[in-house]
């Protein structure tokens, strides 16, 4: 039976949802820009003391902006372009190639019954999110 990309994406969504996996892309460039801009304006308005105050306020504002907004990994998976889904598909099928299944429901049941397979797929998914999407992964308990 040909393996469908959609089936594998559903499987990865199920596993990551079960573990409450979230990811956040940090916007460090935007935070640095805000920090510098506020420090610059503070320096123009208040001279050296204004620069110090502007730098402190800008730094706090920049830090707040870069504390990423977490999105559920299943949502991220489903929003990936087809080429990225294909990458995930290729990596996941290498892990589950020995399983025999007929549809996404059966595949999910087989994987959910194996802690070892779940760990391998979660590690692969966390690695993908961290390296390819440059995001921070978090698990809610």
UniProtKB/Swiss-Prot annotation:
- Which GO cellular component terms, listed alphabetically, does the Swiss-Prot or TrEMBL entry include? cytosol; endoplasmic reticulum; mitochondrial membrane; mitochondrion
Location within or outside the cell: Mitochondrion; Mitochondrion membrane; Endoplasmic reticulum; Cytoplasm, Cytosol
Pfam families, per this entry?
C19orf12
Disulphide-bridged cysteine pairs: none
Q: State the annotated membrane topology for this chain.
A: Single-pass membrane protein
Q: Which UniProt keywords apply?
A: Cytoplasm, Endoplasmic reticulum, Membrane, Mitochondrion, Transmembrane, Transmembrane helix
From the record, give the transmembrane residue ranges. 37-57
Q: Does the keyword Mitochondrion apply?
A: yes
Q: Which family does it belong to?
A: Belongs to the C19orf12 family.
Q: What is this protein called?
A: Protein C19orf12 homolog
């Amino acid at each position: 039976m040909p393996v469908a990309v959609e089936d594998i994406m559903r499987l990865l969504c199920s596993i990551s949802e079960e573990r409450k996996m979230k990811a956040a892309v940090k916007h460090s460039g935007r935070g640095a820009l805000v920090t510098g801009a506020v420090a610059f304006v503070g320096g123009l308005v208040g001279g050296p003391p204004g620069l110090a105050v502007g730098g402190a306020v800008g730094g706090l504002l920049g830090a707040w902006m870069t504390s990423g907004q977490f999105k559920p990994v299943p949502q991220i998976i489903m929003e990936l372009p087809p080429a990225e889904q294909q990458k995930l598909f290729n990596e996941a099928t290498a892990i589950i190639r020995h399983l025999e299944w007929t549809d996404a429901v059966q595949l999910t049941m087989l994987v959910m019954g194996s802690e070892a397979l779940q760990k391998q797929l979660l590690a692969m998914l966390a690695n993908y999110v961290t390296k390819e999407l440059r995001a921070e992964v978090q698990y809610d308990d």
